């Protein structure tokens, strides 16, 4: 993980984040990951998918930002997009509640899978604030340096162009609100879609419809939140 051509990173992000790859925290993070691999630990998502959120959604294409915390830590789940799982994997409980709100808000049929890649391809930056995790060990890579990198991503997006939508669900995501210029963007907050909190304000928040209305009011095409069958 340096700023050279070995980084498989979409060009606009590579340029915008070039200085981050030279920061001391990145060297420490790289060494931590090297040691984890050397110790035989299984790390998710697979290496080529760590930057999937950035590679799927170039900086100029970002319309909506959804923040998650860290990747799913079960086999074949994480693929670099927050809340999303790879095809063929059962839909996680928080995503089930996201689908329930989509159905309630926009009458979108609940899909038979949990892969949100089509959202990312349309301009939804689906960013976890920690980009790796050890198998079966939730939050095991929190505080290891990724938070500095993803904080900078949020700042870059906020500064790059106006009239974006930030969906901040739960206390962790809302802790990043200070990185967003709310005078330029629409920031929508609610409790997390987890089964522990979804019925305390996530279900019924109307965020998907409100996001599209804001985009259209500012001359941007809305997101098609429907997911293709897989």
UniProtKB/Swiss-Prot annotation:
Q: What is this protein called?
A: Uracil-DNA glycosylase
The record's similarity note reads: Belongs to the uracil-DNA glycosylase (UDG) superfamily. UNG family.
EC no. given is: 3.2.2.27
What is the organism of origin for this protein?
A: Pseudomonas syringae pv. tomato (strain ATCC BAA-871 / DC3000)
Q: Which Pfam families has this protein been placed in?
A: UDG
Task: List GO BP terms, alphabetically.
Answer: base-excision repair, AP site formation via deaminated base removal
Major subcellular location class: cytoplasm
List the keywords (alphabetical): Cytoplasm, DNA damage, DNA repair, Hydrolase
GO MF entries: uracil DNA N-glycosylase activity
An example GO CC term for this entry is: cytoplasm
Chain's role: Excises uracil residues from the DNA which can arise as a result of misincorporation of dUMP residues by DNA polymerase or due to deamination of cytosine.
């Amino acid at each position: 993980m340096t700023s050279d051509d070995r980084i498989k990173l979409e060009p606009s992000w590579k340029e915008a984040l070039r200085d981050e790859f030279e920061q001391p925290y990145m060297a420490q993070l790289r060494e931590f990951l090297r040691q984890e691999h050397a110790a035989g630990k299984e790390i998710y998502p697979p290496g080529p998918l760590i930057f999937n959120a950035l590679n799927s959604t170039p900086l100029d294409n970002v319309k909506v930002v959804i923040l998650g915390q860290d990747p799913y830590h079960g086999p074949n789940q994480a693929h670099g997009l927050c809340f999303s799982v790879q095809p063929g994997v059962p839909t996680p409980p928080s995503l089930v509640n996201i689908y329930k709100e989509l159905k309630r808000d926009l009458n979108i049929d609940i899909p038979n899978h949990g892969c949100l890649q089509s959202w990312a391809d349309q301009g939804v930056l689906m960013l976890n604030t920690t980009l790796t995790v050890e198998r079966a060990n939730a939050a095991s890579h929190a505080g290891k340096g990724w938070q500095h990198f993803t904080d900078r991503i949020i700042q870059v997006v906020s500064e790059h162009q106006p009239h974006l939508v930030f969906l901040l669900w739960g206390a962790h995501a809302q802790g990043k609100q200070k990185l967003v210029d709310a005078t330029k963007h629409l920031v929508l907050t609610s409790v997390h879609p987890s089964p522990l909190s979804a019925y305390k304000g996530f279900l019924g928040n109307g965020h998907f419809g409100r996001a599209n209305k804001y985009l259209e009011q500012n001359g941007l095409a809305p997101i098609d939140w429907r997911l293709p069958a897989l």
